[in-house]
C-alpha cells in the first residue's frame, strides 16, 4: 500500500493515541488527560502518515492567536512530532514537517512555534528567538520586598462563574495567547485554581507544600502577593519555581 500524508480521521483517534504512547513511552491515556485542549482538534490539526495501513508518523499543527497589545497574530504551534521507533530514518518526520509548513503557508500563518532540539528543527527554518527569563523567588526575598500573602481561596475550576472570571482576568494581559478551550485546560490532572485580591493563580500539584506555580495574573500588579498566598507555598521551603506561562 502506498504511503500517504493526510489529516487524521475521527475513527483513527484511538489508533493515534496508542501510536503516540508507543513513540513517547507515556502511559495509557496520557495525551487526552494532559492535553485536553488539543485532543478535540485532532481531526483538524493532526497530520499523519500511514504505511501498510498503520500510522507511522505524526505532526500536530495547532492554530494559536497571539495577542500583543492591539495586534493579533495567527501562528501555528507544532506538537506531537513522532515517528514509529521501528521506522525511523525513512524521512517520515521530514515529509510531515514539510507538509505542515505548506499548510501554514496556505493559511497565511506568518509565524510558527515549537519546543525542541534546535539542530533538528533548524533544517526547516526554525531558530531560537525571543527572550526567556528564569526567576528564582523565595519567601525571604518576597517578604523583604514588602509582599504580604494575599487573601485568596481555592475555587472549583469547573464552576462556570470561576471560568468566566479567569477568562476575563486573562484577557487583561497585554501579551497573551487566546485560549479557545480554557475550560479543558483547567481539568488537567493536579490543576488547582486560587482566586482573590483581584487576580488568580493556577498551580499543579495536589499535596500541601508541593505546588508548582503555573500562572499568576493580577491586573493591579499584585503577583508577588498572590505567589505567597497559600500555606502550601510557605511550607514548601525557600524556592518557588514558576513554570513558563506558555506551559498552560
PLM segments and residue spans:
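Short amphipathic alpha-helix that is part of the acyltransferase structural core
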Residues: 1-63, 70-77, 142-179, 210-212
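Short hydrophobic/aromatic beta-strand element in the GNAT-like acyltransferase core
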Residues: 44-48, 58, 80, 190-195, ...
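Conserved G/P- and acidic residue-centered "switch" motifs that form tight phosphate/ATP-binding loops
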Residues: 53, 83, 91
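A short, internal acetyl-CoA/4′-phosphopantetheine-binding micro-motif in the GNAT/acyltransferase core
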Residues: 78-88, 213-222
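Conserved acetyl-CoA pyrophosphate-binding loop and the N-cap/start of the following alpha-helix
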Residues: 87-99, 109, 221-225
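Conserved active-site alpha-helix within GNAT-family acetyltransferase domains
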Residues: 106-110, 116-134
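Amide-forming acyltransferase catalytic core, primarily the GNAT-like/NAT-type
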Residues: 128-223
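C-terminal functional modules
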Residues: 227-248
